[in-house]
Regions:
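FNR/FR-type flavoprotein reductase catalytic core
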Residues: 76-143
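Ferredoxin-reductase
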Residues: 2-86, 142
């Protein structure tokens, strides 16, 4: 069942000029999330932009309750999000989506992704390793 929380931004990294990695304290979400889940983020306390932004979960530190997500600035909403500073609160709803994957059916896994879409595959690869599955990674990038 998704929860709505105010999470504290504890680390902000600019991976490129328009790509950011945020680390937030979100134990309530981390405790119930699985690979494949995502969160929805309210980017502003103002009326506009009205809609939350769906962002995939990159990494979950279950021991410390830290959730990490990576996003690319593509419009007004993600631009506002990129301006948040360490110490700010971020309004999150999550986990959302289908985080169910039955590893017992497979001996080998191929994880395929491209561009900004490779980041949510990290949690899937971590879980596959924990399940002792042989995992092949194919990633496409723009030059």
């Amino acid at each position: 069942m998704p929860v709505n929380i105010k999470a504290k931004l504890v680390k902000k990294e600019a991976l490129k000029k328009d790509v950011f990695k945020f680390s937030v304290e979100a134990k309530e979400i981390v405790d119930i999330s699985k690979p494949g889940h995502f969160i929805e983020i309210r980017v502003s306390d103002q009326v506009e932009p009205f809609l939350r932004r769906p962002i995939s979960i990159f990494n979950m530190d279950k021991e410390n309750g830290i959730l990490e997500f990576i996003f690319q600035v593509k419009g007004k909403g993600t631009d506002l999000l990129s301006k948040k500073q360490v110490g700010d609160e971020v309004d999150l709803i999550g986990p959302l989506g289908n985080g169910k994957f039955d590893y017992s059916k497979y001996q080998n896994l191929a994880i395929i992704g491209g561009g900004i879409g490779v980041f949510p595959l990290y949690e899937l690869a971590k879980e596959a390793r924990e399940e002792r599955k042989k995992c092949y990674h194919l990633f496409g990038i723009q030059k």
